[in-house]
Amino acid sequence: MKELKRNYSFFIDKKVKLVKFVDRTFNCNFKFSTAIWEFLINAETNTQFHFEISADILKPQELELLRRAPKDRFQFEVGVQTTNDEVLNRINRFVNFSDIKEKVVELLEIKNIKQHLDLIAGLPGEDIVSFKKSFNDVYSIEPEEIQLGFLKLLRGSSMREEAEEYGMRYSPYPPYEIIATNDISYDELLTLKKSWIYGR
């Protein structure tokens, strides 16, 4: 922990504008995450720190700590992916959207942390109707930003091994992005991509 704090202090001393933590579930270790957040909250700096978190597992003690964070000191990226609980279970994410939403709303009420909520198009079992509902569910929360990604079937991943089962067609070139599935067509994915690019 001392070594980590020395590293963070280096960024602070150099007046780095943004530091991104690449751990996709930064707060899965309560003791570790609260120690880091406490240190960064108390630091004298304008550096912003970006974390990818699992909002549904935020504890009351963490929320209370985060209330003390200077405005814009932290930004959180929350991987919603879909609000369809059946699809979440299919991709081995055993969490309900209602639990994510509850904590995201609590963070929004604090008004000092910018939140990015991520959606993924092309998930197995999610058709265009389900995706639209996912988007509307997330939009209704009014986060600062919604980010849309398209499913990537990386080599060695369990989802790639199940590609045939769900009729998932994907590019043969890295990063192996989804082209179509049994549930969502190529044209529908292309429309989503164009709408996202030109509608931003």
What are these regions (language model features)?
Residues Q61-L66, P124-E142:
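Catalytic cores of alpha/beta
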Residues M1-K2, S98, V129-K132:
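Residues in well-ordered alpha-helical elements
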Residues W37-E38, S134, A163-G167:
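Short, hinge-like loop/turn segments at secondary-structure boundaries
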Residues I100-K103, S134, L192:
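Hydrophobic side chains in well-ordered alpha-helices
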Residues E3-P124:
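Conserved SAM/AdoMet-binding glycine-rich loop
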Residues F11, P70, V138, W196-G199:
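Alpha-helix boundary/capping residues
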Residues F30-K31, E86-I91, P124-V129, E142-L189, ...:
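Flexible glycine/acidic-rich beta-alpha junction loops that bind and position SAM and/or redox cofactors
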